[in-house]
Amino acid sequence: MDNQLFFKSIIATLPKRIHKCQTVSKAPENCAKMPKSIQFRGFSGTGEPFRRLDFRMGQRAFSYERQRPLAFLSFSSLPGRREGSAWTERLRALWKHCKKDQFKAEGLFRLIKDINLWIAAYKKLSPGSKNDGERPKGTSIKALETLRDSVINPPPTLGGGSSTGRSWPKGHETLERGSKALGPESPKETSLALQKKRRRPEMASPHTILPRVLRTHKVSRALWVVGPSDASLALRGLTQKDKDILVQEVIRSILETLYEPYFLSCSHGFRPGRSQHTCLKQIRRDFVGTVWFIEGETSQYFNKIDKQVLIGLMRRRIRDNRFLNLVQKEIKTSLRAGAEGTGVGPLLCNIVLHELDLFVMRLKRIVDRGRRRAVNPESKELWRQSAALIDRTTAHRARVPFPSGAFGRGLGHPQETRQINYVRFADDFLIGVIGPRALAERIRGLVTRFIEVRLKLRLTLDKTRKPIQSRPNTLPAHYVPMGPKETGPKVENDFTISGGPGKKKTQIFCITKNKKIPFLGYLISRDSKHTYNLVRRGRRYRIRRSGGLSLLVDMQKVINRLAEKGFCDKSGHPKPNFAYFQYPQSYSVARIASILRGLANYYHLANSKRQCVTRLSYILRTSLAKTYAAKFKLGTAAKVFAKGGRDLSKPIKAKKARRPLLNRVLGSKTTAHRRRGAGSEGHSPAIPYTRYGQIKLPDTKPLTKNWQPGQARLNCIAKKNLYQNCNREGND
């Protein structure tokens, strides 16, 4: 047979694409060696593991190779192949089918075997991501493969396991794929072997080369570990905490794809495209006209989650015992490691509290009735009397007396209109009820019992919150500790959240002038007045309306936080913070500016943003000025502002020049010291928001009716494309 025809026939039988050819002499040991045969590397069309094909006399034998092709490292699609790898296509399919209530996912454990998923998880936790404090250190592809194999096939524990229930490979006790247990080598042999490996050129082992996005100078020596007994050296760049974080990120990426389409839109905690701001915007949109508010928070729900309840809920959506067993092992690690918001813990808790969302939505479908709020008869009669007085004489135009709180408390609303609104961010939830007080108390009892009995969680109270004295027609909305002399009027159906000494009870309340609901660092209040002019039939009227919701900054909470950091006292009076005493001016000013910008960014939805940011800027600037007054012995903060300016951008005190000989000896240190900006002239960071006009107006827009995560970004992209098209047409 002609050689050209022979090769064409072989290429036609390949699945999709020929990647590389090798002779039999370079074949691995696990592949059968046949005389006069050629081995090819190819990719399967379904994204199966890479395989070698042996052709001889028209017969074909398969031998799966455990090393990856180099093309996977570049994250680029191959010619003649669909974009994306097997795990991305599988996750897309899961995303489409997970919206069905009866859908159960299978084969999730196979996704963990794909090394590309581990590389993607490492890239997300690598330097430059948002999780700066929770990322693995420099590593290599070999380290990721070893870690993946230890998760899929845990090695036997020698000398005790880790605290997380797993035993990672340690030294010569590591069992590599297709290799036998190796004994300890002598120190001389080990050092000689490492020296030989480090002398190899960079392209000697292409299967252990990191992509450019993962390569760093610090770990360049760790890239050439290819021996089966040197897996511990490949993992030396990863600590035990780093391994746990990386494994949790891989599991989280799979679970997030499975549960994100299933979660309700009322949940905003630890979900992509959602935050505290989206939760507060939904409150501004849906809670208008709400009479009664119920606020709750579960007690340490990151650490007190019930494992049996969690696994039972996950079995409703997952039909893969191997994957569930792996998740069950990771629960212990997730609940022990790190603070809130790290690892897979928040997602697991969202899975549990999703049942609370479904329960409240069922109550909403039962209770809701009446599309539009009927007019309050008492309010309508009062407005009729006021209109008659205005028409009768001009003496009553200035002020018309009304009964106190007749409009604010919503008394006398018809019983035909009832409605429930609900939002949740992580473990904080807020329920708004439109209807009688008995309905609100009934809903409170049902929700609390569901949390304690079905989810096996406990509601908690803020111990720093002072008791509130109840008055007639004014009921507190949040949960407050109450003593025997502070209960106010007797409330029926009051029950205890937690037993034991110091019993704590729950109550419901509506917003009044002096009572506001703290939620996510904001204060939810009702607009007292909204005044505007109306001209009708040639006459001018001054209209005042109330009832809308407004979000305010919880200034006392922010001031208490600043007092803990040493910037002021509990009353908000600035004081010198000697933690910044030894730092140069540029660093201190940049740090204060970062704190102030962060507070302004978080409270950009508050109606009182400009007033509160102005006060916070005064506290932080004055605190730093008093620190510099003590440091440079200027006496008062006014003298510091006179030299440094309102924003403290000018150098307060120039550094004295060194002697010529000392400058030559310590030239590098002096240059580095000036580079940090200590007393050097030139550009220096400045504290923002020194004037009221520099603060931007708050964002008071609520969420749109059919809002979806990422909608704002898509709108910006569409506007950008439209602008570019218009420019192109104009140029043409």
Curated annotation (Swiss-Prot):
InterPro entries: DNA/RNA_pol_sf, Domain_X, GrpII_Intron_Splice-Mob/Def, RT_dom. Keywords: Mitochondrion. The keyword Magnesium does not apply. Residues 176-524 form the Reverse transcriptase domain. One of its GO terms (biological process) is mRNA processing. It comes from the Eukaryota. Its main location: mitochondrion. This is Uncharacterized mitochondrial protein ymf11. It comes from Marchantia polymorpha (Common liverwort). The lineage of its organism: Eukaryota, Viridiplantae, Streptophyta, Embryophyta, Marchantiophyta.
